[in-house]
Amino acid sequence: MSEPFILFGEQHTQALTYSFIVILILCVLGNFLNNKTQEFAAKLIGISLLVFEVTKPFIYIYGFDKPWETYLPLHMCNFSAVLIGIFLLQKKKNQMFFELPFYWGIGGATMALITPDLDFAWPDIEFFMFFYGHGQILLGIFFALAVLKYRPYLQNFWKMAVITILLLIPVLVVNLIIGGEANYWYLMDTPDGESLMDLMPAPPFHMLGVAPLALVVFFITYIPVSYTHLRAHETVLDLVCRLLL
């Protein structure tokens, strides 16, 4: 019988540490490969991402008798996994297929790993699936960033923000149609585990705080790579003002 999941308990911190080490090692080693081998490695990661996302609902629903209403691949992290998986497989790569997962994945998957929506720890299968799935999303993004040398662009930030906000509508409709415990993008309720959403107003008004917070997190995600986009004699503060204005 699995023990209850403890936020920042021993198993949680070990899973975070191992995930970080694996991603770091693979991205460092990737820089020592030639271009052809890098592309091959990228395709392997892309295939792994897509196969996992396609098979995961069936594993949960038919293998472990989980309710289908809550295990469809409709969360932001699922979208990130599919997009970055396709991006890594593309010969002519679509920049937005990298940039959307860059923000959604780094912001969303990282937050998910730090505050997992889990009830039980290892050896519960959901514990493994959760960390494996979110970990490889970050691996795909950082492999594209650190090995393939793709970058998010400033002019696409607001495009990403608009796409994110517009997607809230169909996701909300899906939640309402499915009913029950359907809670994709956590629009209907906060996660079961502890998270920053616990500090927000009670649902559904929690989204009034979550939406702007998400955009702030997305922008903070961009800051570390912003130095590659600074114009001559421009500071990071100038960059922030240019983005906001």
Language model: regions and residue ranges:
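Membrane-interface helix caps and helix-loop-helix hairpins in membrane proteins
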Residues: I61-W68, K92-N94, D117-F128
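Membrane-interface transmembrane-helix boundary segments in multi-pass integral membrane proteins
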Residues: I6-I21, M160, I178-F218
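Conserved small/polar residues in nucleotide/adenosyl-binding loops
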Residues: T228-T235
